[in-house]
Amino acid sequence: MKNISITNRKIEHVEICLYENVEFGSTLFEDVTLIHQSLPGFSLADVSTTTNFLGKKMSAPIIITGMTGGLPELGKINETIAEVIEELGLGMGVGSQRIAIEKKETKETFSIVRKKAPNSPIIANLGAPQFVKGYSLEQVEEAIQMIEADAIAIHFNSAQEVFQPEGEPNYSIEILYKLIDISKSLKVPIIIKESGSGLSMEVTKMFYENGIKYFDTSGTGGTSWVSVEMYRGLRRNNWKAESAKLFLDWGIPTAASIVEVRSIAQDGTIIGSGGVRNGLEVAKAIALGADIGGFALPALKAAVKGKESLMNFLKKVIFELKVAMFLSGNKTIGELKKTPIVIGKELRNWLDSRGINLSYYDSVRKRRV
């Protein structure tokens, strides 16, 4: 299985995400309720969703998180996303740039993003396992320069690597030390990003206490990359595929992950992603502790249909976010971060089991600016 090229794998990943059922688990956003305010005190037109992220102003706290690149057809997806987020004033990340570092001829499928979105927050992307295999500051800077990125996400996908037919699940502590060292030499921040299994308090603490303050939760309830590798394994009669079925919903629900990360990274910046599917869930993520809402799969499905499809999807999300803010009496994103919320039983039990005091956490989330 080692001879499967990165290029073939990237195509297969996108194809499976588009045509197979890859969503498993719960985000637990159903356990987060915003309080309805019958008299908001202002009109819907007064609601402002503007925010700042990575030093740039955004029309709404929404990014399309890293998905793909590396082939002309995948570069076209990146190009479509970039054009739309530039027009709407949003942000985006690219998929893993390892392929462009190892195959220079594929760089254009990533660099097109900055050409089409000169003013938007753009996030570069490399995989954590590569830092065990020799990646260093040089490769990180190359990925950043390739797209003139405002930050670089280092994605952690241990659950996916375990079940990937050609996976290399090596997550030694060397990764932590390398990233801490690299972060001190960069002009842009590192974002610690999960890949569908959620970030825990423990992992957040490792990085936050060493100066890394940006996190992307990517919790359960959205795309299960274990399921993606299960489908790939089934096609190859790989023995791991049957075991993968036990772990399809493995991980931390997105809502719980947001709280776990915020409870540690109290002045950090958090992208709440993983199963976020609409503007109401963006509002819930931000009220709960995130700064930005992140989308991947629904944006991919819209983008492959063309620019208009993605534009319509994101306009709908922004409208839903505004409605949620209006009905909960919040005129700005700053107010939304402090709005009253009710936590349901399952999420409350999770947080209790993890030793997170809800009264104390409520004061933490409301201190955000």
From Swiss-Prot:
GO molecular function, one term: isopentenyl-diphosphate delta-isomerase activity
InterPro entries with a match to the protein in the record: Aldolase_TIM, FMN-dep_DH, IPdP_isomerase
A cellular component annotation (GO) from this entry: cytoplasm
EC number annotated for this UniProt entry: 5.3.3.2
Cofactor: FMN; NADPH; Mg(2+)
Binding site for FMN: 65-68, 96, 125, 193, 218, 223, 275-277, 296-297
Primary subcellular site in the record, as a coarse category: cytoplasm
UniProt: Mg(2+) binding residues: 161
Coiled-coil ranges per UniProt: none
Similarity comment: family membership: Belongs to the IPP isomerase type 2 family.
UniProt xrefs under HAMAP family: Idi_2
NCBIfam families: IPP_isom_2 (TIGR02151)
Subunit note: Homooctamer. Dimer of tetramers.
Function: Involved in the biosynthesis of isoprenoids. Catalyzes the 1,3-allylic rearrangement of the homoallylic substrate isopentenyl (IPP) to its allylic isomer, dimethylallyl diphosphate (DMAPP).
Name of this chain's protein: Isopentenyl-diphosphate delta-isomerase
Lineage of the species this protein comes from: Archaea, Thermoproteota, Thermoprotei, Sulfolobales, Sulfolobaceae
